[in-house]
C-alpha cells in the first residue's frame, strides 16, 4: 500500500505541469450572459469579483495538497482533523464536478477524488472513482498514469482480492470513445454488474446523478429500473414502488414500462395489501403485453388474489383455468390445477370434480412425478373419505405403477396396506402390499417396519 500511496504522491507533483490541460470533451466554459471568460464580465463598482473556473481549480489543487494539521490541545484531534479534511475535500471536488462536468479540469478533479479516497482508506469509494475516471475520461492525458496506479492499488490492497480480476478486466475493456452519456451508462452497468453489496449505495448515488444529467435520454428508464432493483434488494419497498410509478409516468413508451407495471402489481399484492390495485395492474399488463415472459405469472397472481385474498372461489377457479389453457407448459400450470382441485374439494364440496381435476394432472403431465404423485394421493384420500376404499386403492396403486421405487410409491403402498388391513379386513392383501415394500425398498426403515407387520399379520 505504501508503494501505491507514494506513486500517487509523485503523480500529484509531476502532473502539476499539465494541470491546466482541458478534460475529455472540453467545451468553452461560458459565464453570465454567455461571456466566454468570467474575467470579461464587467463588474459594478463595489460588487464582489466572480470566481472563474481556473480560480476554483487552482484552489482545489491547493486543497488537495493540504495535509491534516497537528494540534496539541486534545488527544485524537489529529484523527478528527484528518477525517474532517478528507470529507471536506470530497465535498469540494463533488461541487466542482456538478458545475463543470465533463469539461474544463474535471478529469484532474476526478483524479483528486481517487487519491483522497485512498488516503482515507475508503476502498469502495476509491474503486468507484477509479472506474468512473476510466469510463468517463478515455482521452485524458492523465489516463495512463491513473490506470497504472489503479493496477497497483488493486494488486496490493487486500480489499479487492475477490473482485480483482473483474476490476482489471473492466479497466482494460472500458470504452475508449463514444458520447459521454453512453459511457456514463456503461459505467453504471459495470458497477451494477459487479453485484457487490458494498457498492449498492454508491451505485444509487451515481444512478441519481446520471438521471440528473440525462433524464431526457432513453436510457433513463433503465437507470430507474436499476435503482428500483437496489431498493427492492434492500427491503425499501415503498421507494421502489414510487420509482416504478415515476418510470411509468415519465417514460410510458419505454421498453421498461412493462416490467415496471408488473413489479408494481407484485409490490401492491405482496407488500401493501392493495389487492384491487394489484389486480388492475396485472390485467393492464396482460392487455398491453400479451407476449411478455411474465404473462403466465401475472394471470396466476390474478387467480391467487381472488382465491387467497377475496375468497371468491368461483372466480379463482376461472382465473386458474386461464393459466392452464393459455399457458399449458408453464411452471404455474400444475400448481394452478392442484389449487383448483383443492378449492373444489375443501371450499365448494365438489369431491367428484376435484378427483377429476387430480386425474387430469396425472394424464396430462405424467413427467411431473412429484406433482402427479401429490394429485393421485389427494384423489385417493377423497375416496377414503367417502369410504370408497377400492377406488382409493386404485388411485394409490397408479403411483406405484407409474413411479416405482419413489418415495411417493412407498407411501402409497403403505396406504393400501392400511386400507386392506383396517377397512376392508383383507389381511392377505395387506401382506401382499407389505411384501412389495420389503422387496422394492430393502434395508430401509419402512421395509423393516413392513416385515414386522407381516409377521404380526401372519400369526
Model-derived features: positions:
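Sec-dependent N-terminal signal peptides
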Residues: 4-13
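Hydrophobic alpha-helical membrane-insertion segments, chiefly the h-region
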Residues: 14-18
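Acidic, polar-rich low-complexity tracts and alpha-helical solenoid repeat scaffolds
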Residues: 19-459
Amino acid at each position: 500500500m505504501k508503494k501505491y500511496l507514494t506513486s500517487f504522491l509523485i503523480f500529484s507533483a509531476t502532473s502539476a505541469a499539465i494541470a491546466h490541460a482541458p478534460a475529455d470533451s472540453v467545451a468553452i466554459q461560458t459565464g453570465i450572459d454567455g461571456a466566454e471568460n468570467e474575467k470579461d464580465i464587467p463588474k459594478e463598482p463595489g460588487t464582489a469579483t466572480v470566481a472563474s473556473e481556473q480560480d476554483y481549480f487552482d484552489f482545489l489543487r491547493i486543497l488537495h495538497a493540504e495535509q491534516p494539521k497537528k494540534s496539541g490541545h486534545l488527544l485524537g484531534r489529529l484523527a478528527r482533523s484528518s477525517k474532517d479534511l478528507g470529507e471536506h475535500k470530497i465535498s469540494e471536488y463533488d461541487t466542482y464536478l456538478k458545475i463543470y462536468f465533463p469539461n474544463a479540469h474535471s478529469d484532474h478533479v476526478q483524479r483528486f477524488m481517487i487519491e483522497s479516497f485512498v488516503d482515507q482508506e475508503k476502498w469502495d469509494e476509491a474503486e468507484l472513482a477509479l472506474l468512473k475516471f476510466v469510463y468517463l475520461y478515455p482521452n485524458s492525458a492523465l489516463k495512463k498514469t491513473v490506470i497504472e496506479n489503479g493496477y497497483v492499488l488493486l494488486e496490493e490492497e487486500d480489499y479487492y482480492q475477490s473482485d480483482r480480476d473483474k476490476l482489471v478486466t473492466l479497466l482494460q475493456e472500458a470504452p475508449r470513445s463514444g458520447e459521454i452519456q453512453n459511457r456514463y451508462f456503461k459505467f453504471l452497468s459495470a458497477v451494477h454488474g459487479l453485484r457487490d453489496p458494498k457498492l449498492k449505495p454508491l451505485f444509487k448515488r451515481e444512478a441519481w446523478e446520471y438521471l440528473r444529467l440525462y433524464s431526457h435520454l432513453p436510457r433513463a428508464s433503465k437507470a430507474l429500473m436499476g435503482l428500483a432493483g437496489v431498493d427492492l434488494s434492500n427491503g425499501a419497498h415503498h421507494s421502489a414502488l414510487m420509482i416504478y410509478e415515476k418510470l411509468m409516468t415519465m417514460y410510458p413508451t419505454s421498453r421498461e414500462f412493462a416490467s415496471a407495471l408488473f413489479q408494481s402489481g407484485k409490490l401492491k399484492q405482496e407488500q401493501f395489501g392493495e389487492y384491487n390495485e394489484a389486480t388492475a395492474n396485472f390485467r393492464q399488463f396482460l392487455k398491453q403485453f400479451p407476449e411478455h415472459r411474465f404473462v403466465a405469472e401475472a394471470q396466476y397472481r390474478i387467480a391467487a388474489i381472488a382465491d387467497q385474498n377475496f375468497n371468491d372461489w368461483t372466480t379463482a377457479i376461472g382465473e386458474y383455468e386461464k393459466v392452464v389453457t393459455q399457458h399449458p407448459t408453464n411452471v404455474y400450470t400444475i400448481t394452478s390445477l392442484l389449487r383448483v382441485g383443492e378449492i373444489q374439494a375443501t371450499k365448494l364440496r365438489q369431491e367428484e370434480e376435484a378427483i377429476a381435476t387430480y386425474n387430469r394432472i396425472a394424464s396430462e403431465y405424467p413427467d411431473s412425478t412429484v406433482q402427479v404423485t401429490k394429485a393421485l394421493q389427494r384423489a385417493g384420500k377423497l375416496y377414503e373419505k367417502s369410504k370408497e376404499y377400492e377406488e382409493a386403492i386404485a388411485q394409490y396403486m397408479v403411483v406405484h405403477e407409474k413411479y416405482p421405487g419413489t418415495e411417493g410409491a412407498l407411501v402409497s403402498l403403505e396406504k393400501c396396506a392400511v386400507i386392506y388391513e383396517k377397512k376392508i379386513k383383507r389381511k392377505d392383501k395387506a401382506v401382499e402390499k407389505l411384501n412389495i415394500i420389503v422387496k422394492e425398498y430393502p434395508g430401509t426403515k419402512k421395509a423393516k417396519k413392513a416385515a414386522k407387520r407381516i409377521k404380526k399379520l401372519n400369526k
